[in-house]
Amino acid sequence: LVYRGRKMLDFNIDEILEGEFNQVDIFVKDKDVHFTPKREMPVISMVMRDSFDHLLVKKAQEFGAELLQNSEVKSIENGILKFANSDEEIEAKFIIIADGALSPVSKLAGFKDDRLLIPAIEYEIEVPEEDFERLSKSVRFDIDAAPFGYGWCFPKNNHLSVGVGVLKTKAKVKLKDYCESYMKDLGITTIISESAHGFVIPVTPRAELVKGNCFVIGDAAGFADPIVAEGISNALLSGKIIAEAVSEGNLDLEKTKEKYLEKVNEKLIPELKIGIKLAKFFYENTTIRNLFVKKFGSLAAERLTEVFLGKSTYPSDYKKKLQEKLKMTFSWM
């Protein structure tokens, strides 16, 4: 959980914290490049996703939300939700679809899925004490740990979360092989216990965000950060945006649609589009990128950390800035 997302929560999460890290280690594989941006506040906070989700549900219930468990949506017709395991029907004025990257409910609502989904795999592993001690000092990202992607090593209470993601899906993807190779690069040769899960991350937004009285938000909308594939921050932001839209629209559907699209196109879409372009440069043009990071990597790491903190956004004049830096890079050679 990066700081920009954590500070959007108006409640304490200490009860589920598994670690806080003020420093991030960023490596570029096979290059003599290592950056360690550091801040006074926790850049990244570690939580287990099931504990985090449970806390979110508990807080929502405290504000009057009703939780329906084991209630798989079977169909949506004219604003009426029907369920697979009961005869219950619910008529809703607004249906907010926030069911994650695969988003089966958006399919039932008739949304076309034009998002780019990138594959990732993560292992929760218990390692010998000396390995855990060595790797538990900071959060670590390794660029090029997988082709056209990166790896991560996140220390938790008593284990490590190690994974890889690939941001260019045209290449043949062997996630398990990439992750096993990455673990060897980390010096992990003995694993006491492990559990693995694969998943996809949507890094481009849908063209259509509203259909009838259905609104998609978060990963269901394709709002994950295209550069680092982090989705919780924009999920929280888009949740706040739709809540504001419903309130400011005075429960009127057309006004709510207008408000939601207006706010999303102002606060989210422009930065996502810039992020997509920057990710393409960063992960696909590795030769030029490596020259760039040799000279300006420290500055780029500091700027990315400011984005993690919610203090900055990706630059709207990124083309101009990249061109200037690239000219300086080649004139320096």
Residue ranges and their predicted role:
Residues S247-M333:
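C-terminal helical "tail/cap" subdomain of flavin- and related membrane-associated enzymes
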Residues L102-L175:
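Conserved FAD-binding catalytic core of PHBH/FMO-like flavoproteins
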Residues L1-E18:
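Glycine-rich FAD cofactor-binding loop and adjacent beta-loop-alpha segment at the N-terminus
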Residues K170-V246, N250:
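FAD/FMN-dependent oxidoreductases across multiple families
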Residues L67, L116-A120, G187-G198, K257:
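A short coil-to-beta-strand element that immediately follows conserved catalytic motifs
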Residues M41, L160, A221-F223:
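A short, flexible beta-alpha/helix-coil linker loop
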Residues E15, G19-E20, I26-L108, L117-I118, ...:
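Conserved N-terminal helical subregion
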